[in-house]
Design a protein with these regions (language model features):
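Conserved, single-site charged/polar hotspot
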Residues: 1-218
Length: 218
């Protein structure tokens, strides 16, 4: 009987060891899967946070001397090759080529047009009167024809936008701490406008005049 008990005990120990080994393998696999899933989720979260931290802002560019939201004519060029997309068609232009249109340009403005650069550079608006004779704009440009006139929107990352707002609102000769404070205020204000836009009727978050905060008047 003693031998029988010992044999049963050994068998139970072996079975228990096998179950323990099998469970350990399953747990290891589950832990590895959970770790991989967590790493993927973390990467996606970081990407979303980076995007959320520097979202695109849409700026309605007013006409000469900020007189109106509408333009009678628009002339656009760039210091790099650029393209114009709209109406299911795409046009390509070389650096320095100008695209000009007015309210009478019906064949060209049957719908919205989007201007994008094919490499890093800036768009230039030689017709527009600002502090400089030919103001430059990063990002993309959006042109739309309405009954009242042409509207022009500049879309670019928020942080890039702020680089053009701060020197437009405050001289660069001011103390650095004052400039930092201005940047913080400008960012908070811009993000508030992005959440509760008064320019939504134009498809923009705000405009470039003193009605909001002056943009790219340097």
């Amino acid at each position: 009987q003693s031998q029988l008990q010992e044999q049963v005990l050994r068998e139970n120990q072996e079975k228990g060891g096998n179950r323990s080994t099998g469970q350990s393998g399953k747990e290891s696999k589950t832990m590895a899967e959970n770790k991989a899933g967590a790493e993927t989720e973390t990467a996606e979260t970081d990407e979303r946070m980076a995007s959320d931290a520097n979202p695109d802002i849409r700026v309605l560019l007013c006409s000469d001397n900020y007189a109106s939201e509408y333009h009678d004519r628009i002339t656009i060029t760039a210091d790099v090759p650029f393209r114009v997309s709209g109406q299911g068609t795409e046009w390509h232009y070389q650096a320095g080529e100008q695209v000009e249109f007015t309210m009478q340009s019906n064949e060209f403005l049957q719908g919205d047009l989007v201007f994008t650069m094919e490499e890093d550079g800036v768009f230039q608006l030689p017709y527009l009167k600002r502090a400089t004779e030919c103001p430059s704009y990063e990002g993309s440009l959006h042109v739309e024809k309405r009954e009242e006139g042409l509207i022009l929107i500049n879309t670019l990352p928020l942080e890039t936008y702020l680089c053009y707002v701060v020197p437009s609102e405050m001289p660069s000769s001011y103390p650095i701490e004052a400039l930092k404070a201005q940047a913080v205020c400008a960012r908070c204000y811009a993000m508030l406008q992005m959440e509760n836009s008064r320019c939504e009727e134009f498809g923009a978050d705000l405009d470039d005049s003193v009605s909001y905060q002056v943009y790219n008047n340097i």
